[in-house]
Amino acid sequence: MSYIYLFITAAAVTGALGSSPSYNGLGLTPQMGWDNWNTFACDVSEQLLLNTADRISEIGLKDLGYKYVILDDCWSSGRNSNGTLVADKNKFPNGMDHVARHLHNNNFLFGMYSSAGEYTCAGYPGSLGHEQEDAEFFARNGVDYLKYDNCYNKGKFGTPETSYKRYKAMSDALNKTGRPIFYSLCNWGQDLTFYWGSDIANSWRMSGDIYPEFDRPDSRCPCDGDQYDCSYAGFHCSIMNILNKAAPMGQNAGIGGWNDLDNLEVGVGNLTDDEEKAHFSMWAMVKSPLIIGADVNHLKESSYSIYSQASVIAINQDPKGVPATRVWRHYVSQTDKYGKGEIQLWSCPLDNGDQVIALLNGSNKKRPMNASLEDIFFDSYLGSEELSSSWDIYDLWANRIDNTIASNILKNNKVTNSSLYNATELSYKEGLSKNDTRLFGVQIGTVSPGGLLNTTVPAHGVALYRLRRSR
């Protein structure tokens, strides 16, 4: 049975009966949270996780939806005489169940890491051949999320079936525990994961590891352009490199199973503010998980205001669960120091009948850009209702909090501004159905039938608009 048939059938059932195509009932929207790897790598500890969770809560990010706290590699000291994984007592003196209890008591969800190989990527014991006992270890310790990597896999890759079977072993083991555990594959898109990932998992990485560069080429990330089927994914992949690889994959993702473009680099490295906005916007558009990769205890104000932009998060968490499609891509002569220069239009429908678009400027100069309704509603036929209607344009970044408000929140460790959205009190689905203005940006104009949406987009930047049918 083909993936396309499964996806369409599941989508039809979802619309008719309100059920989910998720293989385990989880991942109805892309996961949100924090992972230590991008900033801390192997420098992990109980104190780091619990202090980070406290900070995420204090500055309002938990109530915006960032609820998974994910412990990455380097947490174990090996296996005991029974073959059971053992947490490093120097790093986690009270054990993993203590970490889980603290997180759960504060309304977080706890994530851990292993690899579908003999070892993890950092050389710690992997789970290949130990799937059931390791799944039971995770369940026993209150784990809600497993990131499952691809290192030291003993050559068990090369065909989709080979990789599928290796990752399915852990999927089956997790399900046998009886504990709901979000299953996040990290096999770098190897062996066409987007075709089979949703059968056994809730998300799957589709490229090599991200790096905080907008479009810098790197020989360690050898595949470029639209090379989504990359036999050697590598690492140090730029934002644009990953985004362009993801362009054709949206059709294979949706409710219950998401393409994972890797953790967010907002607040990591030296990206400009426009680059960070573009990065966050495009991950939201394609329905990638929104996993913070930064040190939240040392976030700059501008990065915090990006992570807290509820009108953009609402695109990512839209109940319809449709990833954006890249409508067009044009190379331009205004190239940056790496010889890169392109512009793109992305568009996707939303659950309430709205449409969201991103005009992405990958050139080195601010430039005027436009989009016609025919491009925006790219699947509509001539004379359709979408093309014959007028649409109000809402800028999804226009209501971004300023640095003064962000600074007050970060310094006082408390959200006092009532205009900030709280998804714990009112979910994004509920807020959208109630037309909560904080989720819709600011109206800046209207585009009429046959007209053009015109704007100016900064270099390495994005214009992100929600279109609502004019009344």
UniProtKB/Swiss-Prot annotation:
Q: What class of enzyme is it?
A: hydrolase
The organism of origin for this protein: Saccharomyces mikatae
EC number per UniProt: 3.2.1.22
Instruction: One GO cellular component term, please give it.
Output: extracellular region
Q: Which residues bind substrate?
A: D72, D73, K147, R205, Q251
Active-site residue list: D149, D209
What is the recorded name of this protein? Alpha-galactosidase
Compartment(s) of residence? Secreted
Q: What binding partners and quaternary form does the record give?
A: Homotetramer.
Q: Which residues get glycosylated?
A: N82, N175, N270, N361, N370, N417, N422, N435, N454
Which Gene Ontology biological process is one annotated for this entry?
melibiose catabolic process
Q: Which family does it belong to?
A: Belongs to the glycosyl hydrolase 27 family.
Q: Where is the signal peptide?
A: 1-18
Q: Which InterPro entries match?
A: Aldolase_TIM, Glyco_hydro_27, Glyco_hydro_27/36_CS, Glyco_hydro_b, Glyco_hydro_melibiase, Glycoside_hydrolase_SF, Melibiase_C
Q: List the disulfide bonds.
A: C42-C74, C121-C151, C221-C237, C223-C230
Keyword terms: Disulfide bond, Glycoprotein, Glycosidase, Hydrolase, Secreted, Signal
Q: What GO MF terms are annotated?
A: alpha-galactosidase activity
Q: Which SUPFAM superfamilies match?
A: (Trans)glycosidases, Glycosyl hydrolase domain
Q: Which reaction does it catalyse?
A: Hydrolysis of terminal, non-reducing alpha-D-galactose residues in alpha-D-galactosides, including galactose oligosaccharides, galactomannans and galactolipids
